[in-house]
Amino acid sequence: MKLYHHPLSGHAHRAHLFLSLLGVPYELVEVDLAAGAHKAPDFLKLNPFGQVPVLDDNGTVIADSSAILVYLARKYGRTDWLPEEAVAAARIQKWLSVAAGEIAYGPCAARLVTVFGADFRTDEVIARAHRILALVEAELGARRFLLGDNATIADIALYSYIANAPEGNVDTSAYQAVRAWLARIEALPGFVGFRRTKIGLAA
């Protein structure tokens, strides 16, 4: 099983983290984004969208971080990470949508400005980041994880860009429930961190 990734991609980190938490064998293949390797013909055969991550499971190719999380949970029968019960499954889908929406256009976008020089309005993306952080803070409340006492792929989908939000000049110090939640994820057996850059508030 190969995971095509880049160490500064939070989307790729989601897949890397979940593979490590599952404890299954895998090989990391770094894609040189700066050199445009993700737009090269060979890579576009794997993912026509030209994005990481991509999982190649002995010829079964899965692109998109959320799709990879779902695939791995189903492949290994890990109903603890992705419950089959209808309400829990729907709640997880909600958070996967948040990861692709509010997280992508909030803390992820804010970090893209500082780390990669992306052309976003800084004030707007930081404001979006704080809106979703406040929502996650309220949703967590006294819960250990997003759905309750145990981590699910919902937590994995949100972790990376929230953990590294300070790199995008997003101050997370006021979100105590979020910070405690991050620490719980980081304490899970098999945890692997998302590479940090000394930029923004993380400098």
UniProtKB/Swiss-Prot annotation:
InterPro entries listed in its UniProt record: Glutathione-S-Trfase_C-like, Glutathione-S-Trfase_C_sf, Glutathione_S-Trfase, Glutathione_S-Trfase_N, Thioredoxin-like_sf
The UniProt keywords, alphabetically, are:
Transferase
Q: Is Transferase given among the entry's keywords?
A: yes
Q: Does the keyword Transferase apply?
A: yes
GO molecular function list: transferase activity
GST N-terminal domain boundaries: 1-80
- The residue ranges of the GST C-terminal domain are 85-203
Q: Which CDD domains match?
A: GST_C_7, GST_N_4
Q: Which family does it belong to?
A: Belongs to the GST superfamily.
**What is the protein's name according to its record?**
Protein GstA
Instruction: Tell me which species this is from.
Output: Rhizobium leguminosarum
